[in-house]
């Protein structure tokens, strides 16, 4: 677990308590319920599931300045469903990508690979769907889930150095991963995604953004204490995209009052405005 990972359980606990409070449960009751019921169950389940995961043989674990969720891999999909980020959210995210058969798709920070597998079904055998993540257990789960039923490919890699030639992909996706990167890596990492996209290629980002109302500001305020998430809540993602030379950058929608979808285009003639 890297130095930022300990923020994750506390943030998840705070969000879970906030949801319980919206249901009329008092603060201390909500926190106690989460601590006594949710956390031990998740820890025990995670230990059980982790013991059965295949290990990535002969693969070098990439170094990254971002936060990885290696420890969360066994129950990541369950937590996503709990927070309303399950299959319907992934399908909505892919609709913003407008994928076509035969296209080459890159999922940066793919986690357990749900988006990558869905994309593989769209681009078909004439296309390519690749997911990368720096967390070995995430990649192990992704490969296990894709075995025998998907053309998706998964690689252990970090956004600092994407293991692909320049201009390799038509579409890239960064779903709920930029808030795991410090500000300087957001900028550098988006530049690396820009490099591997073809001219005219599109990047779809969905991530934390400025809360839409005072209630969500109240629930999200702990995230302002973390440099990785603070820039998201200040509404800076479009600026990072433009700094990486994407042009134009469009906002395509909102979800849950806290998430925004963006589409960013690599110009047909890089270096010139589109």
Set out the residue ranges of the language-model regions:
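Class I SAM-dependent methyltransferase SAM/SAH-binding core
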Residues: 106-108, 112-161
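C-terminal alpha-helical "lid/dimerization" subdomain adjacent to the S-adenosyl-L-methionine
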Residues: 60-63, 83, 187, 204-244, ...
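Conserved class I S-adenosyl-L-methionine
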Residues: 46-98, 114, 220, 224
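N-terminal auxiliary segments of SAM/dcSAM-dependent transferases
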Residues: 18-63
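A short SAM/SAH-binding and catalytic strip from SAM-dependent methyltransferases
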Residues: 171-184
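A short glycine-rich, Lys/Arg-flanked "PGG" loop and its adjoining helix->strand segment in the class I
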Residues: 187-199
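Helix-to-beta-strand junctions that scaffold the AdoMet/dcAdoMet cofactor pocket
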Residues: 124, 181-182, 197-198
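A short acidic, Gly/Pro-enriched loop at the edge of an enzyme's catalytic core
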Residues: 160-171
């Amino acid at each position: 677990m890297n130095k930022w990972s300990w923020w994750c359980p506390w943030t998840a606990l705070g969000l879970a308590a906030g949801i319980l409070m919206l249901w009329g449960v008092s603060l201390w009751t909500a926190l106690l319920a989460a601590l006594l019921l949710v956390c031990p169950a998740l820890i025990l389940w995670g230990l059980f599931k982790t013991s059965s995961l295949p290990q990535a043989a002969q693969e070098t674990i990439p170094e990254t300045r971002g936060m990885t969720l290696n420890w969360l891999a066994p129950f990541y999909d369950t937590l996503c469903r709990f927070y309303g980020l399950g299959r319907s959210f992934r399908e909505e995210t892919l609709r913003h990508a407008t994928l076509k058969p035969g296209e080459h798709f890159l999922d940066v920070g793919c986690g357990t690979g749900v988006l990558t597998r869905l994309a593989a079904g769209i681009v078909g055998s004439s296309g390519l769907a690749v997911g990368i993540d720096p967390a070995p257990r995430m990649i192990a789960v992704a490969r296990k889930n894709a075995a025998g039923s998907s053309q998706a490919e998964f690689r252990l890699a970090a956004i600092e150095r994407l293991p692909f030639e320049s201009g390799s992909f038509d579409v890239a996706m960064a779903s709920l991963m930029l808030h795991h990167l410090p500000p300087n890596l957001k900028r550098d990492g988006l530049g690396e995604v820009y490099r591997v996209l073809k001219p005219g290629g599109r990047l779809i980002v969905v991530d934390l953004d400025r809360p839409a109302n005072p209630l969500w500001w109240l629930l999200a305020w702990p995230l302002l204490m973390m440099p990785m998430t603070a820039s998201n809540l200040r509404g800076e993602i479009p600026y990072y995209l433009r700094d990486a030379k994407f042009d134009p950058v469009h906002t395509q929608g909102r979800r849950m009052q806290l998430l925004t979808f963006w589409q960013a285009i690599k110009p047909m003639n890089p270096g010139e405005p589109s």
